[in-house]
């Protein structure tokens, strides 16, 4: 499974690791992903999403039903 947030679409990005002498070597910045289980009252079931910390905050603000509608509108499964 890829390291992508299902709500925000955050994914790993690349950059440089810098030593004290400012030598550059490539590195990856990974999103802060968590598997989180939500109860969907309308469907009477749990769903598990792979979310970044920001994605969890968005669901706290908008509600799980509204966020799932946005995911469906993009044509994605959850």
Swiss-Prot record:
One GO-annotated biological process of the protein:
translation
Gene3D superfamilies registered for this protein in UniProt: Ribosomal protein L28/L24
Which cystines does this chain contain? none
Q: Which domain of life is it from?
A: Bacteria
The terms under GO molecular function for this entry are: structural constituent of ribosome
- One matching Pfam family is Ribosomal_L28
What keywords sit in the KW lines? Ribonucleoprotein, Ribosomal protein
GO cellular component terms?
cytosolic large ribosomal subunit
Name the family the entry cites. Belongs to the bacterial ribosomal protein bL28 family.
Name of the protein: Large ribosomal subunit protein bL28
Species in which this protein is naturally found? Hamiltonella defensa subsp. Acyrthosiphon pisum (strain 5AT)
As recorded in Swiss-Prot or TrEMBL, the protein's gene is named: rpmB
